[in-house]
């Protein structure tokens, strides 16, 4: 069964591809395989809105089942920021390091783990060319370190520590992170729908 991961981000593609391969025989593609495809601009205030818009658009344009996701980092002490600005927190043209630097600056006066609490919220949508979709949500709670640690991952990974873990997401191995992350939790909830699609395809072939 053909399925397209609606992302050009290497880490997201790897994590999702690893998960899909564990489920069954998917022919897996990503947006890097469709250089002429133009994704819609993210304008939603919630991960669910952006993931759904991306998924439905890509599924229709590429005539394929699609997996799309959107993730936001929320810091309650900052009234939910970065939130919908997670990808542009330090500006439209800023890089991940700039966003992390701004977050640390905004949290300078916050010292306790309670005050520095944060969580990632991820919504993943499985969408069909006909407009049918399934969605799942994953949350990972933790707190923001007072300095960057680790060189793996992307985004805010080098600042985020999951509760009960002593390493940031950027210090964890991909295998470990892929079991406990917000994206992993959302993907696991989608597993029954994906397996059902595979079973239906096998039946139709026979």
From Swiss-Prot:
The active site is at residue 70. Gene3D superfamilies: 3.90.950.10. One of its GO terms (cellular component) is cytosol. Keywords: Hydrolase, Magnesium, Metal-binding, Nucleotide metabolism, Nucleotide-binding. Substrate binds at residues 7-12, 71, 154-157, 177, 182-183. One of its GO terms (molecular function) is ribonucleoside triphosphate phosphatase activity. InterPro entries: dITP/XTP_pyrophosphatase, ITPase-like_fam, RdgB/HAM1. It is an enzyme of class 3 (hydrolase). Its EC number is 3.6.1.66. Binds 1 Mg(2+) ion per subunit. SUPFAM superfamilies: ITPase-like. One of its GO terms (biological process) is purine nucleoside triphosphate catabolic process. Its cofactor is Mg(2+). Mg(2+) binds at residue 70. It catalyses: XTP + H2O = XMP + diphosphate + H(+); dITP + H2O = dIMP + diphosphate + H(+); ITP + H2O = IMP + diphosphate + H(+). NCBIfam families: RdgB/HAM1 family non-canonical purine NTP pyrophosphatase. HAMAP family: Non_canon_purine_NTPase. Homodimer. Pyrophosphatase that catalyzes the hydrolysis of nucleoside triphosphates to their monophosphate derivatives, with a high preference for the non-canonical purine nucleotides XTP (xanthosine triphosphate), dITP (deoxyinosine triphosphate) and ITP. Seems to function as a house-cleaning enzyme that removes non-canonical purine nucleotides from the nucleotide pool, thus preventing their incorporation into DNA/RNA and avoiding chromosomal lesions. Belongs to the HAM1 NTPase family. This is dITP/XTP pyrophosphatase. It comes from Chlamydia caviae (strain ATCC VR-813 / DSM 19441 / 03DC25 / GPIC) (Chlamydophila caviae). The lineage of its organism: Bacteria, Pseudomonadati, Chlamydiota, Chlamydiia, Chlamydiales.
């Amino acid at each position: 069964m053909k399925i397209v991961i609606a992302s050009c981000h290497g880490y997201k593609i790897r994590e999702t591809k690893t998960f899909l391969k564990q489920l069954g025989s998917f022919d897996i593609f990503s947006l890097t395989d469709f250089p002429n495809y133009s994704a819609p601009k993210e304008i939603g205030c919630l991960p669910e809105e952006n993931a759904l818009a991306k998924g439905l658009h890509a599924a229709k344009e590429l005539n394929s089942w699609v997996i799309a996701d959107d993730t936001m980092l929320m810091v309650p002490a900052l009234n939910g920021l970065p939130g919908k600005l997670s990808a542009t927190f330090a500006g439209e043209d800023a890089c991940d390091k700039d966003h992390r630097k701004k977050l640390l600056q905004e949290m300078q006066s916050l010292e306790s783990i309670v005050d520095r609490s944060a969580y990632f919220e991820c919504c993943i949508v499985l969408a069909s060319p006909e407009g049918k979709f399934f969605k799942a949500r994953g949350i990972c709670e933790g707190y923001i370190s007072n300095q960057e640690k680790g060189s793996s991952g992307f985004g805010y990974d080098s600042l985020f520590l999951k509760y009960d873990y002593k390493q940031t997401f950027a210090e964890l191995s991909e295998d470990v992170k892929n079991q406990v992350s917000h994206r992993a939790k959302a993907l696991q909830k989608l597993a029954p729908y994906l397996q059902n699609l595979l079973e239906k395809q096998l039946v139709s072939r026979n």
